[in-house]
Regions:
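Regulatory modules associated with amino-acid/nitrogen control
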Residues: 1-185
Length: 185
């Protein structure tokens, strides 16, 4: 955690660093209080169940099929609220091969979820597309399905031309721009 904070721009104090320190505090408190720490497989199961709660049976089954192709690391790396948001984004766009969702994360940072067919050089392609879309990447979580068919990637990014928070309209437009840039790449 300390190395993560030191590795980022010193002028960048934001919710991301706040969240890192909060997580460190909570885990330290659990250890000091000797509360049992859950196994990563239990955390993954809990987060998966939590992500499914708001959906009807058909959509739950669709998401269970999707989740079954991801390992525990995916669920341990993504917080429950992000998994719920990603799940809703997938359900809204389940007829698409390329799914892009954008949401405000902390202050002027954006969380970008991209689910796409896996291919050679995909990470490079996605980073170039985000750069071409006017974004600076702060963090990335890259996941490939167990069967190597699709990738479910999450980026934390900042718009390179301003520091303001994005409106819902801005986020939808950004999603469309990323999709367009992906297709044209």
């Amino acid at each position: 955690t300390i190395n993560d904070i030191r590795a980022t721009n010193p002028a960048l104090w934001n919710g991301w660093k706040h969240q890192l320190l909060k997580d460190l505090y909570v885990l330290s408190r659990l250890k000091i209080n000797k509360e049992p720490v859950k196994a990563s497989s239990d955390i993954a199961k809990d987060r998966m169940k939590n992500a499914l709660v708001d959906f009807n049976k058909d959509n739950q089954n669709y998401l269970k099929d999707y989740f079954s192709n991801l390992n525990n690391i995916y669920f341990n790396k993504n917080p429950s609220n992000s998994l719920k948001w990603q799940s809703a984004t997938i359900i809204k766009n389940k007829d698409k091969d390329l799914i892009v969702g954008c949401k405000n994360r902390f202050e002027n940072l954006i969380e970008i979820f991209i689910k796409v067919d896996n291919s050679e050089g995909l990470f490079y392609k996605l980073t170039k597309i985000l750069e071409h879309s006017g974004l600076n990447i702060i963090d990335a979580n890259i996941f490939t399905s167990i069967d190597n068919i699709f990738a479910a990637n999450t980026f934390i990014a900042k718009f390179s031309h301003h520091d303001r928070k994005f409106s819902k309209f801005d986020l939808k437009e950004l999603s469309k721009r990323i999709e367009k840039n992906y297709i044209q790449f």
